[in-house]
């Protein structure tokens, strides 16, 4: 088992998944403008590395869902605290093996999410499965402990940044490498690297 990104990416590390050499879930490279020229024009160039621990979100309202199965029409309606109702909709269709038109996801006002709810969460799918099995309505609410145990949180992140500045404080160039530890089964949280 690897407990940090550096170990998982080290030479000779066991490849965890077929088609993912170097144990990289995804690599994104972006270049804008003349970075080398920007550093050459800088009066000051600073380079530093930062480490950010994994974060578990603590929203005020709990993770909860109400699922209703309409047996007569073969339709599911799910009310959930999600930030991404369309992703939940697609995941429910796939997991319940239903046509997408047979599923409706309702997202009420979400008081807090902080990125925690930017992927389909297990309790949403479980609520849908239970409602169908019961042939009616199921309400599922996770305790704080259950939420911490079943969610990946925001991944541990290492950032190496180099920045060029003029004497007036204008930024002339930035070079950054950001690595997030997503684990063997990365979730949507890895997309936060792009924000």
Regions found by a protein language model. Give the residues of each.
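Structural alpha/beta core scaffold segments of enzyme domains
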Residues: 1-195
């Amino acid at each position: 088992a690897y407990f940090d990104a550096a170990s998982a990416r080290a030479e000779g590390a066991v490849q965890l998944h077929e088609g993912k050499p170097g144990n990289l879930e995804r690599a994104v490279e972006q270049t804008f403008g003349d970075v080398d020229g920007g550093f050459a024009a800088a009066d000051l160039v600073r380079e530093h590395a930062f480490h950010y621990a994994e974060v578990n979100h603590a929203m005020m309202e709990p993770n909860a869902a109400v699922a209703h199965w309409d047996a007569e029409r073969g339709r599911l309606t799910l009310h959930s605290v999600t930030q991404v109702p369309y992703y939940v909709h697609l995941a429910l269709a796939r997991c319940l093996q239903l046509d997408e038109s047979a599923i409706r996801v309702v997202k009420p006002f979400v008081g807090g999410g902080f990125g925690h709810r930017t992927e389909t969460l297990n309790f949403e799918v479980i609520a849908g499965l239970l409602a169908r099995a019961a042939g009616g309505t199921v309400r599922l609410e996770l305790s704080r402990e259950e939420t911490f145990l079943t969610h990946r949180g925001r991944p541990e992140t290492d950032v190496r940044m180099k920045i060029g500045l003029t004497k007036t404080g204008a930024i002339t160039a930035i070079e950054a490498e950001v690595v997030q530890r997503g684990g063997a089964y990365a979730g949507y949280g890895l997309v936060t690297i792009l924000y």
